Amino acid sequence: MAKRAKKATTRTRSKKVKVAIIGAGGRATSAHYPSLHANTKAEIVAVSELNEDRMHKAADQFGIKGRYGSYVAMIEKEKPDAVYAIMPPHHMYDVCATVMEMGCHLFVEKPPAMTSEQTRQLAILARNNKVLSGVTFQRRFAPVIRQGKSLCEKRGAVHSAVATFYKNAVGAGPYYRGAIDILTSDAIHAVDTLRYLCGGEVESVASDVRRLDAEHCNVHLALVTFSSGATGVLLTNWMTGRRMFTVEIHSPGISVFGDPEEGGALYADNQVEPIRSLDPCKMCGSNEEFRAYGAFDVNDHFIQCVQTGKQPETNFADATKTMELVDEIYLSQI
């Protein structure tokens, strides 16, 4: 397989980024396709999907001409600037490695791989092939969380933060028939959000991981200290009453309590009433979920990075740190 010549990394801002997408499942078509379709800086030129019905449905819905059963053939023919690989995590590594070796910038869903070592190797491949990489840790980019953190930091650095992810999965089996654990596959959203809120590097971890009425780990709780001086609390539990993702962000005299989907509030100076409400739809100016919950913003960030040659915030090297914190949570049980 011949490696095509790379385009220059630094691009003219007005030129649209040509994107090819591998995968046309539910997550891809509800978040990534609409985000890219709505982005004036990007153009989806092709889709590759083994399921022809899904491929044609997605291509018809978003007006995509290129349709392929082979992602390698798609890249060779379409010569995209960037490729999105949106598929189950245990199918990812070889596809990601091949895409980058073919000279394309790469954006993937979380988790970026099955293990922290695989993620580190992907970061090395990205560096060696001089391509940009990004992972869909969209909670960082959700307006409630991103703007909430910024508002708190006007008073000083974040000293404490909490990230929770609860689901009602009572009686449910493990993810992908046991191919991957819940913390790495899904609750990693809260792990990455905690890293983002606290800043700095992980210094110490104390955790409690449980199999609650199940044969797989479904409860992950942790206390994490960071070199920034902040302390973070992680609470993820798949045996609760309902699905909910929440954060607490605390700087001196000011706090955010919020949910990136349901909204939040900013409190300060011991006042009972919030000084500002955080409505995700009002903050982004849209009622569309892919805009209000962070998907559009994380996609837009990646596209802008491709245009400018800047490494995305959630690149594989940074994602390796999130995956390593997942490892530490398992290794640091009290």
Report the location of each language-model feature.
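Contiguous beta-strand/loop segments that form the cofactor/metal-binding neighborhood of enzyme cores
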Residues: S185, V191-G263, F296-K310
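C-terminal glycine/acidic-rich active-site capping loop/insertion
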Residues: Q138, E248-A317, K321
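Beta-loop-alpha module in the N-terminal Rossmann-like domain of NAD(P)-dependent dehydrogenases
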Residues: N51, K65-A123
